[in-house]
Amino acid sequence: MNTYLDGDLIRLARRVHNTRRAYLLVNPLQGKHIPVSPGAALSMMGALGEKLALEQPGIDLVIGFAETATAVAAAAAARMGRPCHYIHTTREPGTSGESVEFREEHSHAVEQRLRLSRLRPWIDRARAIALVDDELSTGRTMVNAIRTLGEACPSIRQKPLTVASLVSRLGPDPMPALADWDIRFVSLVHRPMEDYTSAVSRYAIEPARSPEGKGLDYDEGVLPISGMDARDGVGLPEWLDALAAASDPLLEGMADGLRGKRVTVLGTEECMLPGLVFGQRLEAMGYAGRVRFHATTRSPIGVGRDEGYPIRAGWRLRSFYDAGRVTYIYNLEACDLAIVITDSRDDAATKAAMEDLTAALREAGCGAVRLIREERHVQHL
């Protein structure tokens, strides 16, 4: 199992227009705000799964937290060495069925929800449950989620719970409000709780800007993984296997155009694992000269040029899921080809988002763009 130090997983950035918390811990290996080798990102996420399996064997249900931990939790679950069910929270409205809501109190977008149609019977049958986030500071979001699940799914009170994260800043008595629950804690890195407001105040920042001019033309393709949506719940490793099986034929068909090229694979908001797996398969096949992955996000982060500051460039984009919502992409690098992988159901929002994103990619020095949408969300007219 790979080991990591806090210097491997933590960079400090300034939030924009967030009165709850002025700073953000940015993980350079997570594949969200900073381009990263897909293999390196999945190795780090897998290390958390290996640690979970070692310290808390028997987990057969994993719950991940949107937006930034959707891939973290799934990749960790897949590396635990046993089949399990996986579901992640979402900020997107549900299409049908019952769900429960809770608050992520320090976030720019505080409302989170869990869909219950599959989750409730999974909780009833589970031997042990893990709740996985990328970073835990106060633990309030996790407390809110566990309390909400306790009300909606009372059987969870009889299950051993493990709260896992890449980075934990929880203290010795992390969740006194849940003292009567059976809860354990696992993390890759532990760092004492500290307020970094003054530490980030020295950085000169400006907000991300809207791209200018016309975007690049782009080709479209389909990733055929019908019927699998982690917002509703999926099985692992089946979901990971399906993503790999769907990616390989696409990559083989693109092989001649990828040889020696610099390729950036981009996910969209909560949709991160499909792009990470696609990028990792491309990386492993050896077609491309360089593969990097990161994703769009709802998080408004300051852009700065001070030495050591992690967010060096940023663009405002319309969301792939709601054209009236603002999202962002940070640290785009020059590349020969950008491949955007999304599970958006909204054709109009996807078109609007691609207009903005391709304009940002053009400004960053990208040569060509390909959009790949998951098959279940393509409307056949």
List PLM regions with ranges.
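PRPP-associated nucleotide enzymes
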Residues: 1-381
